């Protein structure tokens, strides 16, 4: 069940592919500047959390509306001759990352962009959110002990069998100094 939960979030948060029967971020990015796009409960709750909780908590550092800039970097990486994006292109894209241009209508459960050049990219928060929601769903289904490690996002449920706490090691990215 956890695999299915994670797969569902992967499909919802995918900005590169459409999936039959799923309105995901690919669809939102393609259509939300033209008209409001109705999305699932799961995707709407996530977008609302991103805008109202994650964005202010990180002083804007987790801006899911930065897709226009992140697309430039993605395209540069995928190019036959990878190179950093042009500074003028980055400056132009930065004009289209205002989170306030992301309009979420709670009553209709729709997503709309007031800036036609806006695009969403949830890479900064999507995987962690998916892991947390998957862990909560597993607990609701009765799982009492697990250690999830999904691409570096670690989430413990309960304790190890036998009652000892879970431990997770984190490598110091600056070398051998344990600080």
Region annotations inferred by a language model:
Residues 1-179:
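Mature catalytic core of soluble alpha/beta enzymes
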């Amino acid at each position: 069940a956890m695999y299915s939960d994670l797969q569902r979030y992967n499909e919802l948060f995918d900005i590169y592919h459409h999936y039959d029967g799923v309105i995901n971020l690919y669809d939102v990015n393609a259509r939300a500047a033209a008209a409001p796009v109705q999305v699932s409960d799961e995707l709407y709750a996530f977008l609302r959390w991103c805008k109202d909780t994650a964005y202010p908590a990180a002083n804007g550092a987790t801006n899911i509306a930065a897709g226009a800039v992140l697309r430039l970097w993605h395209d540069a990486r995928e190019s036959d001759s990878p190179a950093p994006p042009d500074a003028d292109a980055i400056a132009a894209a930065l004009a289209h990352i205002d989170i306030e241009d992301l309009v979420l209508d709670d009553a209709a459960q729709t997503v709309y962009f007031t800036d036609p050049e806006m695009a969403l990219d949830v890479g900064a928060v999507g995987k962690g959110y998916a892991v947390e929601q998957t862990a909560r769903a597993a607990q609701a289904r009765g799982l009492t002990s697990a250690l999830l490690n999904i691409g570096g996002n670690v989430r413990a449920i309960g304790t190890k069998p036998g009652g000892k706490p879970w431990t997770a090691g984190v490598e110091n990215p600056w070398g051998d100094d344990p600080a």
